[in-house]
Design a protein with these regions (language model features):
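A short, structured N-terminal alpha-helical element that caps or precedes a catalytic domain
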Residues: 1-167
């Protein structure tokens, strides 16, 4: 078991991909979750970024996460900070973790493209955020760290009742 990094940065699984180099695949993530089986979506359209299987650290991350990491490195040591894959958070989080920062693009599926492609339905982007939240909530109960959410889609979570959907 890891003692965890002091600061853990992450994003939901729909953002931890390069969409096979085809930006149009990013739009597929805005589609209804029920349309394509999740394993097909993950394998075909949204393959995971390269990740260290021992630590959960991603090799490539969104620019916003790297900017936050860079700013934090002015005050903290490199070994205190990690950008972790959302499906491997348990490898990065532990008793030493004080904060988990989450970058979001469209966490509740309320952005224009998503509401157009998935009206009244759960989109992949929202489902991936929901899955990550379930993991973060369980780890937070165990270790008591703070959670900070930011990014282009953080406006979707501005009303307190919206996070109750995810258990916080």
């Amino acid at each position: 078991m890891s003692d965890g990094k002091r600061i853990v940065l992450t994003a939901d699984r729909s953002l931890m991909t390069n969409y096979r180099g085809n930006f149009l695949y990013g739009f597929i993530a805005c589609g209804p979750y029920e349309l394509i089986p999740e394993f097909v979506f993950d394998k075909l359209f949204c393959p995971s970024v390269e990740t260290n299987k021992n630590t959960g650290e991603v090799k490539v991350a969104q620019c916003g996460l790297r900017r936050i990491e860079s700013a934090l490195l002015k005050e903290y040591q490199r070994d205190e900070i990690i950008i972790s894959h959302p499906e491997m958070l348990e490898k990065s989080i532990g008793p030493n973790t004080t904060v988990v920062g989450i970058n979001v693009m469209d966490p509740l599926g309320m952005a224009p493209v998503t509401t157009t492609m998935s009206p009244e339905k759960l989109s992949y982007v929202a489902m991936k955020f929901k899955k990550m939240c379930a993991s973060v909530i369980q780890l937070k109960k165990k270790y008591g760290f703070k959670v900070v959410v930011g990014g282009n889609g953080s406006w979707e979570l501005a009303k307190p009742d919206r996070m109750k959907i995810h258990g916080e």
